[in-house]
Amino acid sequence: MAVQGSQRRLLGSLNSTPTAIPQLGLAANQTGAWCLEVSIPDGLFLSLGLVSLVENVLVVATIAKNRNLHSPMYCFICCLALSDLLVSGGNVLETAVILLLEAGALAARAAVVQQLDNVIDVITCSSMLSSLCFLGAIAVDRYISIFYALRYHSIVTLPRARRAIAAIWVASVLFSTLFIAYYDHAAVLLCLVVFFLAMLVLMAVLYVHMLARACQHAQGIARLHKRQRPVHQGFGLKGAVTLTILLGIFFLCWGPFFLHLTLIVLCPQHPTCSCIFKNFNLFLALIICNAIIDPLIYAFRSQELRRTLKEVLTCSW
């Protein structure tokens, strides 16, 4: 969990130039005086991680408590919260160890610290991959519930949802382990970038299609009640704003991290790219912010879940 300059060691393999990628012959520190580096204090990392940790623990506990929330949809939401919880937990653990090592309050051999760092890297990477997968799974689940409403309960059954969840976790752990082991291969980084783009396109296509169907439905209702066109336009505008916020937050929080991976492959030692690499901590902080925002978008909008959350907070088990 060593820190190189201002860069934390978490997923530190991403901060170094992969040896398998051709070099461009430029020094990595040739970023120029114009380069802007956003410093993220360890205290801020710790605070963001703790907020996300508590928030997602509450989501998992709430869904576990109420049997009415044990449907496939809430299973996916629970697993998303668990993934975000692991991302935050890994961040909190690493930041705490870094602070203890720097303060001299924790003494450990370099080999032990390296092994601990590798474990945290695998946990964090696998939880990030699973988080993206569950965001996609939630989009697919909602799409089926709208376009195949009559067959939804026969298509999305609890056993199928559990098998899908198990497959996502196994694949996430497997691929994250391979990624950490072979991070110095450009193909591995490109696979991660392609995976992110695939999830982004999947979510965009499904949610845009759902918005179009909702607008058609609202237009049909307006015609039945002989209402004017502005009602439909207002509904469509509201839906478009909601969709923009949902996809915008996803892209803004995850996009910079995968841009970082892309630039490692395309221009590992170009001054402009090197400047972007210096903000790796900021990109990680944005992902943790996404872990804080996810429950607000996918979980706490449910009235049943909010009611159960109040019971959890008042310890009325």
Swiss-Prot record:
Gene Ontology MF annotations: melanocyte-stimulating hormone receptor activity
Gene3D superfamilies: Rhodopsin 7-helix transmembrane proteins (1.20.1070.10)
Record lipid sites (S-palmitoyl cysteine): C315
Glycosylation sites per record: N29
Positions in the Cytoplasmic compartment: 64-72, 141-163, 212-240, 301-317
Any one cellular-component term (Gene Ontology): plasma membrane
Similarity comment: family membership: Belongs to the G-protein coupled receptor 1 family.
Role of this protein: Receptor for MSH (alpha, beta and gamma) and ACTH. The activity of this receptor is mediated by G proteins which activate adenylate cyclase. Mediates melanogenesis, the production of eumelanin (black/brown) and phaeomelanin (red/yellow), via regulation of cAMP signaling in melanocytes.
Protein name: Melanocyte-stimulating hormone receptor
Gene of this entry: MC1R
